[in-house]
Design a protein with these regions (language model features):
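Double-stranded RNA-binding/processing signature
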Residues: 1-121
Length: 121
């Protein structure tokens, strides 16, 4: 879960940067936009899509599965247990890529997520 802890921060800052660069508005409006990207429900949806489309490498999938299956006593607000597990797996992959300094792959995955996000808007 340490990878997910780091990955949560990385994913959050990338989401904030994306919103700040691409949307105008008051801070409260920008925060709401960021929330639609970083919520456990949204992350779970993005991860399901990536799994269905075989976006993850073999190593990333191992990290994802290990994090998803880890016993965790926390629970996300407004998300099911399964959504929370999917989101935790996504965050772990982001943490892994960041710590491996694989910034190109991190950006590639985030761009894929943003493409999915923009299609839903």
């Amino acid at each position: 879960l340490t990878l997910a802890y780091i990955g949560d921060s990385i994913y959050d800052i990338m989401s904030r940067e994306y919103v700040m660069k691409n949307h105008l508005g008051k801070i409260n409006e920008l925060h709401k936009k960021v929330s639609t990207i970083v919520s456990a429900r949204a992350q779970a949806s993005f991860m399901e899509n990536m799994l269905e489309n075989n976006i993850l490498t073999e190593d990333e999938e191992k990290i994802y599965n290990r994090a998803k299956n880890q016993k965790n006593n926390s629970k996300a607000k407004n998300a099911s247990i399964m959504e929370y597990k999917l989101a935790t797996g996504l965050e772990a992959v982001f943490g892994y890529l960041y710590l491996e300094k694989n910034f190109e792959r991190l950006e590639e995955m985030f761009n894929y997520i943003i493409k999915l996000y923009e299609e839903k808007q």
